[in-house]
């Protein structure tokens, strides 16, 4: 462990500094109280290394401010100490050394000229020798080339050296006139603007701290501030360097962090903020949002696929309820996050669109129409039955009222007869008691009530027979619905044929109708929806094998499709087409689910 730590420490440190560094590293790496993962986390968690680094940086900045304050408080003393040291002696020494170098330079030039003349003489002698001796041609030409190249290189080096010396001499001669002002003006200016200079130099570190602590809005503000400084001071190398460092922090650390956040389970407001931050920094701060949309949908697709894969289907086939629950959760993930991702971008940014139409599946459309036709006929029959029942109930209520009236009259008649008999028969009044009279009246009323009940039963039986006969008359054979539909189709064809159309007009009408059905659609968003739907359906077919799904699952898929229809009708048609192409559900199941959904929300149009 000590060998590893010693290799990490620089050799430029003193023994005391090395000892302090070793103690600090051992305290961190061999601590029993600190968790390794939580301590070395990249986030600003309390007790982590990020927080320790931030505290140390804060202490360093505090010390820098303290030093700066002491320098500003003692500005006059510092300037006095600097100006008291007269450097004329040093300048004189430099001038003397330059004079010596100048003399050396002139001597070298003279020697070079002499060498050039000697080389010319030698060249002449060589040419004579070449003329006299042809066998030495190769050796002499090689020697001539080497001498010429050496002379040119020497002249070039001497010329550069001579230029450097002349520049230095000119600089000293110009500054001899104002020796008292040397370094005074620039130093005073730097000390007066020391606060602004230090603030400017701390901008890259401040941007890095804001990004690491999650203050992205402040980091974006720093980036805009540095760009404004570059426009205000276009020729300043210091400002350019500061801007480049801030841009490097923004385009690497901040960009990668925000893009990674797009592939996590974040809320709608967080998604909006992340997109706004990305839209304000390069490379997404251009005129169009196409690149931002591509990156955003790619990361959201990664998150959606990971969420769908987190609900496995590798459970026992006997546990159908658990399988159905997992399938419904997958569909719920698709419905929620696809809609949320598209809706956030649609509401916040501009995007390119093209007129496009994805037609409703023809097989599914025919089955839906057929089911709707049968349902309408059933509704008509039910309404007719309800109206007939209401009529019969009214008739029964009228008959019951009449029977009640007749019963009341019969009771009153019996009572009158009894009273007449009581009054007329004085002799038999002693024999008959009041109880006997009451018994007679009760028996008579009971006999009449039994007769009336028998009559009511007979009338009800007759009414029921009449109802059955009427219902049998109303019943339609299985062939009649299709005949009615065929009749409707024939009538529509006749109406179309009645309209006179020139040879050029049909194509125009067809084109106009197609244009009316087309709606503006973004190709990247449509591709995103297609990929998500395909992934879910493939995952279901691969995980379920031969297990059949219930109608409730089909209904939930249809709900998901109608949810996407709120954004764009083409997404809805594409979803239904994808479901119909798979073997998960039959066309009848899908049509019934659509019809069921239409009962709850009749505002949706299927084609």
Swiss-Prot record:
Residues 375-394, 406-466, 480-491, 505-514 have a biased composition (Basic and acidic residues). The modification Phosphoserine is found at residue 410. Residues 375-514 are annotated as: Disordered. Disulfide bonds: none annotated. It comes from the Eukaryota. It is a peripheral membrane protein. GO terms for biological process: cytoplasm to vacuole targeting by the Cvt pathway; intra-Golgi vesicle-mediated transport; retrograde transport, vesicle recycling within Golgi. One of its GO terms (cellular component) is cytosol. Keywords: Golgi apparatus, Membrane, Phosphoprotein, Protein transport, Transport. It is found in: Golgi apparatus membrane. InterPro entries: COG8. Belongs to the COG8 family. Acts as a component of the peripheral membrane COG complex that is involved in intra-Golgi protein trafficking. COG is located at the cis-Golgi, and regulates tethering of retrograde intra-Golgi vesicles and possibly a number of other membrane trafficking events. Present with 6440 molecules/cell in log phase SD medium. Component of the conserved oligomeric Golgi (COG or Sec34/Sec35) complex which consists of eight different proteins COG1-COG8. This is Conserved oligomeric Golgi complex subunit 8.
